[in-house]
Amino acid sequence: YRIGLGGGSVSSVDTGRYSSGIELNAVQRANAEMQKRAYNVVRALCEEDTNPVVSIHDHGSAGHVNCLSELVEECGGLIDMSKLPIGDKTLSAKEIIANESQERMGLLIQEEAIEHVRKVAERERAPMYVVGETTGDHRFAFQQADGVRPFDLAVEQMFGSSPKTYMVDK
């Protein structure tokens, strides 16, 4: 839906500075029930003897482009836009890519764990979508069903050489 567009920017300015339409579209709409379902999935996976989650990121400012790019910043990835859930078919590619909807998590999981994670999501009644894959080409792209890539950048252009922080859970 056309919500949560520019929320990260609009949240940093005084109310009324932009037109009401821009501010209304920037407001993220929360859904406590879906938030709890997503939390239950993540918690269940993390509590398993072998956690299938390689990396996880929430959809905050800049939506899919921020979340999914950070999941694959070490190797690159290709996102199939036709696999992304879309509630409004009139959205532009930019609106789909940068939508800051709430209660969405991006998970990087091994291919062999997809069906297991899907079963956990189904048990918790949380929607799950497999939307892309890692590529190893150090590029991050969104590709439409017709093959057009409205977003295609080298990972280095997005992240530069910022220091990395690694946390290990024991």
Task: Go through the PLM ranges and name each one.
Residues G106-Q110:
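Short hydrophobic/aromatic beta-strand micro-patches
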Residues A26, I56, M105:
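Conserved short-loop catalytic and cofactor-binding motifs
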Residues Y1-V41, L45, D49, V53, ...:
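Intein/HINT protein-splicing elements and their conserved insertion hotspots or analogous self-processing inserts
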Residues E33-Q102:
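Active-site-proximal betaalpha loop/short-helix elements
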